A protein has these predicted regions:
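Membrane-interfacial helix termini and the short, flexible loops that connect transmembrane helices
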Residues: 98-99
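Acidic/polar-rich alpha-helix caps and helix-coil junctions
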Residues: 1-93, 103-202
Length: 202
């Protein structure tokens, strides 16, 4: 299956690069907020990571423009399915462990969830912070995700200093105009990120 997925992504990128769709495609076919090329690169990075091709995963992650978000848009007519299942039906909600197990001061927890303390069968439940309305968009990828894929690939390729810099780049990311989770944490000392197990755990 992975081979087929990667082949489809390679084909999609080749066709998109060859044609470079014009205004008709961009205004009438492409969903608003979708960046086709960056999304293909991000999917290649994800699936190459799963396939264990660290060099290819790193190469694809490095091609993603981290200053660009790519999202799936929704509206009151085409409702965000996570919002629908979580807010209207109440079937899907995040467990409070996402928030409680986060490192102290990690701003990504509050980006993703809001405290609700709803009684669940196993754990108390929170609410999704990012899917509070019918029209909330769903990102195809986050820039920080691409940085972490790169960090993992660098670790597995033996580049500990490069991986450490990538991990700390994610930890210290704070501010900016993009709607993305930002940790706003301090960088970790080199001595805490000087082995592959430490980097992969982080």
């Amino acid at each position: 299956v992975l081979t087929s997925v990667l082949a489809l992504l390679d084909s999609a990128l080749a066709q998109y690069s060859a044609v470079r769709p014009g205004s008709e495609f961009n205004t009438s076919i492409r969903a608003a907020g979708l960046d086709v090329e960056n999304t293909i690169y991000a999917m290649q990075a994800r699936y190459q990571r799963i396939a264990g091709d660290h060099s290819a995963a790193l190469a694809a992650a490095n091609l993603v423009n981290l200053a660009v978000l790519s999202v799936m848009p929704f509206s009151d007519q085409a409702i965000n399915p996570i919002h629908d299942l979580s807010n209207r039906a109440g079937y899907v909600k995040p467990r409070d462990t996402l928030r409680l197990t986060a490192e102290a001061g990690d701003a990504r927890a509050a980006y993703h969830v809001t405290v609700a303390a709803i009684r669940g069968n196993v754990r108390p439940l929170d609410n999704f912070a990012q899917y509070a309305s019918n029209s909330s968009s769903i990102p195809f990828y986050y820039p920080g995700e691409m940085r972490l894929i790169g960090a993992e690939a660098l670790t597995n390729l033996g580049d500990i200093p490069g991986a450490r810099a990538a991990v700390n780049g994610v930890r210290t990311k704070c501010g900016g105009s993009l709607n993305e989770p930002k940790a706003c944490l301090a960088a970790l000392a080199d001595t805490l990120l000087d082995t592959a197990p430490e980097l992969l755990a982080e």
